[in-house]
From Swiss-Prot:
Sorted UniProt keywords: Cytokine, Cytoplasm, Inflammatory response, Secreted
Job description of the protein: Pro-inflammatory cytokine primarily involved in epithelial barrier repair, polarized T-helper 1 (Th1) cell and natural killer (NK) cell immune responses. Upon binding to IL18R1 and IL18RAP, forms a signaling ternary complex which activates NF-kappa-B, triggering synthesis of inflammatory mediators. Synergizes with IL12/interleukin-12 to induce IFNG synthesis from T-helper 1 (Th1) cells and natural killer (NK) cells.
Stated family: Belongs to the IL-1 family.
Matches recorded under PANTHER family: INTERLEUKIN-1 FAMILY MEMBER, INTERLEUKIN-18
Modification note: The pro-IL-18 precursor is processed by CASP1, CASP4 or CASP5 to yield its mature, active form. The pro-IL-18 precursor features autoinhibitory interactions between the propeptide and the post-cleavage-site region, preventing recognition by the IL18R1 receptor. Processing by CASP1, CASP4 or CASP5 induces conformational changes to generate critical receptor-binding sites. The mature form is then secreted and released in the extracellular milieu by passing through the gasdermin-D (GSDMD) pore. In contrast, cleavage by CASP3 inactivates IL18.
Pfam families attached to this UniProt entry: IL1
GO cellular component terms listed in the entry, alphabetical order: cytosol; extracellular space
Taxonomic lineage from the root: Eukaryota, Metazoa, Chordata, Craniata, Vertebrata
UniProt subunit comment: Forms a ternary complex with ligand-binding receptor subunit IL18R1 and signaling receptor subunit IL18RAP at the plasma membrane. Mature IL18 first binds to IL18R1 forming a low affinity binary complex, which then interacts with IL18RAP to form a high affinity ternary complex that signals inside the cell. Interacts with cargo receptor TMED10; the interaction mediates the translocation from the cytoplasm into the ERGIC (endoplasmic reticulum-Golgi intermediate compartment) and thereby secretion.
Site (Cleavage): residue numbering on this chain: 35-36, 70-71
Cellular localization per UniProt: Cytoplasm, Cytosol; Secreted
InterPro entries: IL-18 (IPR015529), IL-1_fam (IPR000975), IL1/FGF (IPR008996)
Protein name as annotated: Interleukin-18
Length: 192
């Protein structure tokens, strides 16, 4: 028997079975929770790279970084204020989030096929899977109190990063090989 806490501070026991050296929980009334993400409350945020450049959505719906004073962030709020939805995760791997923007239509950041883009969609209330192209794990960076990194839930070891291409600083998905890689570090300034 395994114990699980319930709301009235009592312990409810769940039956278990060993079958072929594997432990299985026996669901009572089919109420065991499967792996999934459940949407919680959003936060409105400005995301910056370590060069203090602001992430914004370009006219082509692409995520790029640009030098921008705070007053310009306010003037361009639909393109610079991101809606970070937090999700309850049935596994413990970090704070599960989606990153969306409401600019004409709602768009949500995706790393499908390891390519960063915005999909025209509202973040779903529930995602019945343990990985998704739109879920990232937001974590603090060890040794950096105010720095955040976002790991893909679909591609373990791959993080959102800032990369200079031609004259633009783009948001990309990158395998992190080195804990000192500053391109995968961001600051998140909450607006609400």
């Amino acid at each position: 028997m395994a114990a699980e806490p319930v709301e009235d501070n009592c312990i409810s026991f769940v039956e278990m079975k060993f079958i072929n050296n594997t432990l299985y929980f026996v669901a009572e009334n089919g109420d065991l929770e499967s792996d999934h993400f459940g949407k919680l409350e959003p936060k409105l945020s400005i995301i910056r790279n370590l060069n203090d450049q602001v992430l914004f959505i370009s006219q082509g719906n692409q995520p790029v970084f640009e030098d921008m004073p705070d007053s310009d962030c306010s003037d361009n709020a639909p393109q610079t204020i991101f809606i970070i939805y937090m999700y309850k995760d049935s596994l413990t791997r970090g704070l599960a989030v989606t990153i969306s923007v409401q600019c004409k239509k709602m768009s949500t950041l995706s790393c499908e096929n390891k390519i960063i883009s915005f999909k025209e969609m509202n973040p779903p209330d529930n995602i019945d899977n343990e990985g998704s192209d739109i879920i990232f794990f937001q974590r603090s960076v060890p040794g950096h109190d105010d720095k955040i990194q976002f790991e893909s839930s679909l591609y373990k070891g791959y993080f959102l990063a800032c990369k200079k291409e031609n004259d633009l600083f783009k948001l990309i998905l990158k395998r992190q090989d080195d804990n000192r890689d500053k391109s995968v570090m961001f600051t998140v300034q909450n607006q609400n």
